[in-house]
C-alpha cells in the first residue's frame, strides 16, 4: 500500500522509545486504548498493517511529528486472564499529523527529506562514524544497510540509522532529531552526539573495550586500532598455559579446526565452548601450602569443641603432608550423625593448610554423568561436577569435600560410586578423564575429604579407598560449651545484637537441649538460639521505635535475661518436650527390657516387649523387624531352652511367644539387640521384672557369649538423655568405653559383661550409682 497525504491510519501512542525511519522497534502494548486499537484494526487478516506511531510528551500533548510504520509482527498472549500484545514495527516515513481523533488520525503531510549536503567535512565525519558502527555490528544485515546507504549517498537515512543505535540518547533528544528540519540539521546533530560520546561502549552495539577509536572531532582521519576477535583472544589464553604433549596436540588440533570453521556452522559453538573450558581450567595454577601445626592445632581447637581424637588424627594427617610435601594416597572420610561438624572440620583443614575449599554435594546423584560429565555429542552437554568445581576455584590443589558420599544411588544411568573410583585412586587420578573434557586432567594434587552418615551404605570398592574417621554425637556438657562458645556468638552476630544486650543462662541452654532437641548434633539447638535472638531483636526494635527521636535506648533492663523459667515463653509452640521412656513405662512388667540402637542421626533407647500365651512354642514378631534381628530372637530363645534347667530358669517350650519392638513404622535390624532379647525372654520365663533404670546392648552367640557391637558412645549418650543410669556393654567394647569423657563415665554406671549370665545379673540387681542419687 502506498502512503499518501490525508490518509486515515490507526494510532499507537507511546511514551518512551522513538522509531526513526529505517530502524526497527519492539513496542510492548500496555494501555487499554492501544489494546483496543490493535484488536480493532490489526488483528484482522490484512496485508495493509500500517500504523502511525505518535509520541505523547505530556498528559494532554502529542508531539507534532510522528512515524509511519509497518507492523512486521504482532504477538499476543494471555496471562492471568488478561490479553497482552507486543508489536515489532519498522519505521518508514516521518509525518505531520492532523485531526488526531483516537484511535485514528489524518496524515496531513508525509515528510521524506533527503536533500543534498554541501558540507563535505560533515559527510566525511558521518561516514567515518557509520563505518565504525558497521564494523562492530552484531549482524551482517545491519552492516550491509550502512554500506548500502553510504554507496547511495543517502546521508539523511544514514544519520537516522546511526542515531537509532545510540542508547545514551533520551526520549526528548530523539524527538528533537525526529522533528529536525532538513537533512543538514539531522546530520549535524548525529555528528555532535558522536563527538560527545567518544567511548564506543555507549552504543547499543556494545563495541569491545579495546576499541578506543573515538569519532574524529578535528576532521582528520584517525587509525582505528585492530580489534582482536574472540578466537584470537582464546588462542592467547591457550598459549599462556603449559600443557602436556598429549593434551597440547589435542587442544591445538581443535583450535585449528575452529579457525577453519564458519561461525554459522552448528559445531562452531560446541567447539568454542570446549576450548573456553580448557582455557579456564587451572592446569598450572596451585596455591602454596602453608602448614604450621601449631596454627592448625589452634584453628581446630578454636573452631570445634571436644572431638579430641578426630583433631589429633587430622593433625597427624597434616604432619604427614608437611613431611611428604604431598597428599597422595590419603583420603579422609568423616562419618557420623548430621550436625556434628563434619563439613566445618573440613573447612578448618583447608584454612590450616592455606588452600582453597571447594564443596561438592553428592546427595541424591543417580547419574554417572553428574560426576564425569556428558559426551560432547549430546545436546546441552556439560562437564561433570568435579571439573566444574575446579573451574570455579581456579586452583588445581584445593581441599575438595565430597559431601554426603553415602547418598549416591545406582540406576539405569550407571553407578556414580563407580565413577568416583578413578577420581579417588592415587594410581589413576593423575590422568582423570571427564567425558566432556575428554583429555586427561591431573587431580592428584587435590586433597579429597568425604563425609557420610552411614558408612555401611558405601560400596566396598569405594570404602576401601577411604580412611574412615568416626565422629560421634555430643554429650550434654559438650553441647552446652558449643552453644556458649560458638552458636550464641554466631547468632548474635547474624542478628546484629551486642553481647551486652542479652545473657543466656546455662540452665536455659540445658532446658533447650533436653526439652527442645533430640539430636546427636547441634543444628536444632542453633535454630532455637536463633529464635531467642529474633525475640531479643524484636524487643530492642520496639523499644527504639517507641521514641523515633531518641539517640539512646529507653529505660529497660539490659542485658535481657534468658533463663530456664522464661525460655518457654519465647519458643512457645516450638516447645516439643518429650516424655522420657523411663517415666512412661515405669514400672516395667516382666518381659520388657530397654535395648539400645544407633541410627544415622545418633543413638536411641529401644524398648523390647515380650509376652507369652499357651501354645506350642511358636514365635511371633512385630515391629518391622529385619532378618538379622529375627535371627537374634531365635538365638536368644535357643540359648534359654538349652540353659533354663542349668540356671534354674522357667521354660517357654509350651508357650507361644510374641516379641514386639515399638515404633512399628520404623525399620529395625542389626545384631546388637541380642542381649536385650535374651533378658526380655528370661524375665518373661521367670516372671521377674528387669530394672527400669538400665539398658543393655550387645550381640550374643548360641553358647552364651556376648560379642562386640558398634556405636558405643552414641548408645551411652542416648541412655543418659533418657534418664537411664546403668548401661550393660560387651566386655570386648571396653576400649571404646574408656575413651569416653570422664564426666560421662562418672555419671553412668557401665557394666562390662562377657556372658549372658553376667548381663542378666546386671539387669536385675541394684545399681550403686542409682543408690547415690
Curated annotation (Swiss-Prot):
E.C. number: 3.4.21.53
Catalytic activity entry: Hydrolysis of proteins in presence of ATP
Keyword Nucleotide-binding annotated: yes
Active-site residues annotated for this sequence: 672, 715
Family: Belongs to the peptidase S16 family.
Record GO terms (molecular function): ATP binding; ATP hydrolysis activity; ATP-dependent peptidase activity; serine-type endopeptidase activity
CDD domains linked: RecA-like_Lon
Pfam families: AAA, Lon_C, Lon_lid, LON_substr_bdg
Residue span, Lon proteolytic domain: 587-766
Lon N-terminal domain ranges (all copies): 9-198
Record PANTHER family: ATP DEPENDENT LON PROTEASE FAMILY MEMBER (PTHR10046)
Domain of life (superkingdom): Eukaryota
Compartment(s): Peroxisome matrix
UniProt keyword annotation of Protease present: yes
Organism phylogeny: Eukaryota, Metazoa, Ecdysozoa, Nematoda, Chromadorea
UniProt entry keywords in alphabetical sequence: ATP-binding, Hydrolase, Nucleotide-binding, Peroxisome, Protease, Serine protease
Chief place of localization: other
Source organism of this protein record: Caenorhabditis elegans
Binding annotation for ATP: 336-343
Gene this protein is translated from: lonp-2
Single Gene Ontology BP annotation: protein quality control for misfolded or incompletely synthesized proteins
InterPro entries: AAA+_ATPase, ATPase_AAA_core, Lon_bac/euk-typ, Lon_lid, Lon_proteolytic, Lon_Prtase, Lon_prtase_N, Lon_prtase_N_sf
GO cellular component labels: peroxisomal matrix
Annotated function: ATP-dependent serine protease that mediates the selective degradation of misfolded and unassembled polypeptides in the peroxisomal matrix. Necessary for type 2 peroxisome targeting signal (PTS2)-containing protein processing and facilitates peroxisome matrix protein import.
Motif (Microbody targeting signal): 771-773
Cystine crosslinks: none
Protein name stated in the entry: Lon protease homolog 2, peroxisomal
Amino acid at each position: 500500500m502506498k502512503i499518501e497525504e490525508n490518509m486515515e491510519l490507526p494510532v499507537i501512542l507511546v511514551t518512551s522509545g522513538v522509531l526513526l525511519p529505517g530502524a526497527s522497534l519492539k513496542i510492548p502494548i500496555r494501555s487499554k486504548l492501544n489494546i483496543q486499537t490493535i484488536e480493532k484494526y490489526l488483528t484482522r487478516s490484512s496485508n495493509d498493517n500500517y500504523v502511525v506511531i505518535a509520541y505523547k510528551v505530556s498528559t494532554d500533548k502529542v508531539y507534532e511529528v510522528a512515524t509511519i510504520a509497518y507492523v512486521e509482527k504482532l504477538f499476543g498472549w494471555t496471562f492471568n486472564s488478561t490479553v497482552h500484545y507486543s508489536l515489532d514495527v519498522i519505521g518508514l516515513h516521518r509525518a505531520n499529523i492532523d485531526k488526531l481523533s483516537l484511535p485514528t488520525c489524518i496524515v496531513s503531510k508525509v515528510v521524506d527529506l533527503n536533500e543534498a549536503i554541501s558540507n563535505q567535512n560533515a559527510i566525511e565525519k558521518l561516514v567515518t562514524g557509520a563505518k565504525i558502527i558497521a564494523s562492530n555490528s552484531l549482524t551482517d544485515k545491519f552492516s550491509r544497510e550502512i554500506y548500502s546507504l553510504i554507496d547511495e549517498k543517502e546521508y539523511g537515512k544514514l544519520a537516522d540509522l546511526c542515531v537509532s543505535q545510540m542508547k545514551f540518547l533520551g526520549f526528548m533528544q530523539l524527538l528533537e532529531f525526529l522533528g529536525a528540519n532538513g537533512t543538514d540539521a539531522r546530520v549535524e546533530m548525529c555528528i555532535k552526539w558522536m563527538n560527545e560520546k567518544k567511548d564506543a561502549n555507549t552504543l547499543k552495539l556494545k563495541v569491545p573495550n579495546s576499541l578506543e577509536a573515538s569519532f574524529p572531532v578535528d576532521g582528520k582521519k584517525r587509525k582505528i586500532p585492530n580489534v582482536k576477535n574472540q578466537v584470537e583472544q582464546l588462542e592467547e589464553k591457550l598459549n599462556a598455559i603449559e600443557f602436556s604433549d598429549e593434551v597440547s596436540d589435542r587442544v591445538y588440533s581443535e583450535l585449528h579446526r575452529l579457525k577453519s570453521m564458519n561461525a554459522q556452522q552448528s559445531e562452531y559453538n560446541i567447539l568454542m565452548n570446549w576450548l573456553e573450558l580448557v582455557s579456564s581450567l587451572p592446569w598450572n595454577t596451585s596455591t602454596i601450602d602453608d602448614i604450621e601445626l601449631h596454627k592448625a592445632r589452634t584453628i581446630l581447637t578454636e573452631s570445634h569443641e571436644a572431638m579430641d581424637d578426630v583433631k589429633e588424627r587430622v593433625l597427624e594427617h597434616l604432619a604427614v603432608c608437611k613431611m611428604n610435601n604431598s597428599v597422595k594416597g590419603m583420603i579422609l572420610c568423616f562419618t557420623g550423625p548430621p550436625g556434628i561438624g563434619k563439613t566445618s572440620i573440613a573447612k578448618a583443614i583447608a584454612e590450616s593448610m592455606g588452600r582453597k575449599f571447594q564443596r561438592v554435594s553428592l546427595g541424591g546423584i543417580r547419574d554417572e554423568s553428574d560426576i564425569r560429565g556428558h559426551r560432547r555429542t549430546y545436546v546441552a552437554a556439560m562437564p561433570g561436577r568435579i571439573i566444574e568445581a575446579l573451574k570455579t576455584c581456579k586452583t588445581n590443589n584445593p581441599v575438595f569435600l565430597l559431601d554426603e558420599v553415602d547418598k549416591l544411588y545406582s540406576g539405569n544411568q550407571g553407578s556414580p560410586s563407580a565413577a568416583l573410583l578413578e577420581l579417588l585412586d592415587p594410581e589413576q587420578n593423575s590422568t582423570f578423564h571427564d567425558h566432556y573434557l575428554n583429555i586427561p586432567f591431573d587431580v592428584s594434587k587435590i586433597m579429597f575429604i568425604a563425609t557420610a552418615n552411614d558408612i555401611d551404605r558405601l560400596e566396598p570398592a569405594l570404602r576401601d579407598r577411604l580412611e574412615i574417621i568416626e565422629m560421634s554425637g555430643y554429650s550434654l556438657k559438650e553441647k552446652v560449651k558449643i552453644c556458649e562458645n560458638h552458636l550464641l556468638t554466631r547468632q548474635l552476630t547474624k542478628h546484629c545484637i551486642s553481647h551486652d544486650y542479652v545473657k543466656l543462662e546455662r540452665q536455659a541452654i540445658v532446658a533447650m537441649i533436653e526439652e527442645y532437641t533430640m539430636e546427636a548434633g547441634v543444628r536444632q539447638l542453633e535454630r532455637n538460639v536463633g529464635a531467642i535472638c529474633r525475640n531479643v531483636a524484636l524487643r530492642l526494635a520496639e523499644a527504639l521505635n517507641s521514641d523515633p527521636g531518641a539517640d539512646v535506648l529507653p529505660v529497660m533492663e539490659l542485658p535481657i535475661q534468658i533463663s530456664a523459667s522464661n525460655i518457654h515463653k519465647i519458643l512457645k509452640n516450638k516447645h516439643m518436650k518429650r516424655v522420657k521412656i523411663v517415666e512412661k513405662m515405669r514400672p516395667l512388667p516382666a518381659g520388657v527390657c530397654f535395648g539400645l540402637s544407633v541410627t544415622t542421626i545418633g543413638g536411641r533407647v529401644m524398648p523390647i516387649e515380650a509376652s507369652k500365651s499357651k501354645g506350642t512354642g511358636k514365635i511371633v514378631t512385630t515391629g518391622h523387624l529385619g532378618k538379622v534381628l529375627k535371627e537374634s530372637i531365635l538365638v536368644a530363645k535357643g540359648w534359654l531352652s538349652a540353659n533354663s534347667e542349668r540356671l534354674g530358669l522357667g521354660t517357654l517350650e509350651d508357650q507361644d511367644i510374641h516379641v514386639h519392638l515399638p515404633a512399628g513404622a520404623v525399620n529395625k535390624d542389626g545384631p546388637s539387640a541380642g542381649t536385650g532379647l535374651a533378658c526380655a525372654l528370661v524375665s518373661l520365663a521367670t516372671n521377674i521384672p528387669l530394672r527400669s533404670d538400665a539398658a543393655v546392648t550387645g550381640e550374643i552367640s548360641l553358647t552364651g557369649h556376648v560379642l562386640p557391637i558398634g556405636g558405643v558412645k552414641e548408645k551411652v549418650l542416648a541412655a543418659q538423655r533418657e534418664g537411664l543410669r546403668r548401661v550393660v556393654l560387651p566386655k570386648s567394647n571396653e576400649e571404646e568405653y574408656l575413651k569416653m569423657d570422664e564426666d560421662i563415665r562418672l555419671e553412668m554406671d557401665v557394666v562390662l559383661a562377657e556372658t549372658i549370665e553376667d548381663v542378666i545379673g546386671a539387669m536385675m540387681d541394684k545399681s550403686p550409682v542409682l543408690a547415690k542419687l
